[in-house]
């Protein structure tokens, strides 16, 4: 397929779905299919949102280029570049390893992580590997965003707050999570380890209590990636930061977020005085969750097969404030997980 044909496929998908699909999305889709016939690996390698991939696959099948049976099989040679995989095996491409955190933080965290509550769909949960969590905390340590700092974690099925507290570096760690199981688990771990860690049940659609507004130096969050979810999670994080020089760590995917959404997110940050200082793609690797057949995307998939290895990843973005973010501390109305609102 030449570029003209790629553009044609993208335009057809845009007309049929209203999604901002570009010709590079089609090219990356084809490149991933050159590398694998496994649906989940194709999702990971393409870096294209799943909502885009399904209609692109359908368009390729109509053209006789793709056969969908037990896997995704290309039926013709295409000039799309095959995605390279040259990540360092020691750090899995992250550029740092959590095992170098101070003291016994990594050892103690790995022990506690084995006891964490199971991810459930009620709270749209899915947790990253322990190595991903430790590496995230290590990056914050590298930037001086832990030692002596007040740290806030917004949603914590990954146990980032626990990993940070176990380093012995933060002055205080506060975790907000809607799942009472997570809160009880963190309270038990904090008591057993003697940590300056507190956890609270809090629905991020609700305003932050005034005591938490402009009260922290660092926040961590992996937001629900619908437009309202980004507003609720990242907006609350910015509002919680004290002001200039404070930092946030945010996970953002390609599976659920198009480059158009990434652009809107970057504009949102700039409008609120935040600048991106680090962006490490594929930093977080997610464990496969047990409820995958119940996830919203399952009915769309042309091949109904559970993944055999991790496939869902997200980038880690570090942001820093140039000024205090004065966002409205109001209730966020609507469904944070609204699939039809994602793009």
Curated annotation (Swiss-Prot):
Per the record, what are the reactions this protein catalyses?
2 S-adenosyl 3-(methylsulfanyl)propylamine + spermidine = N(4)-bis(aminopropyl)spermidine + 2 S-methyl-5'-thioadenosine + 2 H(+)
| Localisation | Cytoplasm
Q: Which pathway does it operate in?
A: Amine and polyamine biosynthesis
Known EC number? 2.5.1.128
- Gene3D superfamilies reported in the protein's UniProt record: Vaccinia Virus protein VP39, Winged helix-like DNA-binding domain superfamily/Winged helix DNA-binding domain
- Which keywords belong to this entry? Cytoplasm, Polyamine biosynthesis, Transferase
* InterPro entries listed in its UniProt record: BpsA, BpsA_C, rRNA_MeTrfase/Polyamine_Synth, SAM-dependent_MTases_sf, WH-like_DNA-bd_sf
Root EC class = transferase
From the Swiss-Prot or TrEMBL record, what is one GO molecular function term? transferase activity, transferring alkyl or aryl (other than methyl) groups
Q: An example of a Gene Ontology BP annotation on this entry?
A: polyamine biosynthetic process
One GO cellular component term noted in the UniProt record for this chain: cytoplasm
**Which HAMAP family would you find in this protein's record?**
Aminopropyltransf_BpsA
Sum up the protein's function in the record's words. Involved in the biosynthesis of branched-chain polyamines, which support the growth of thermophiles under high-temperature conditions. Catalyzes the sequential condensation of spermidine with the aminopropyl groups of decarboxylated S-adenosylmethionines to produce N(4)-bis(aminopropyl)spermidine via N(4)-aminopropylspermidine.
Family the UniProt entry places it in: Belongs to the branched-chain polyamine synthase family.
Which protein are we looking at? N(4)-bis(aminopropyl)spermidine synthase
Q: Which organism is it from?
A: Thermus thermophilus
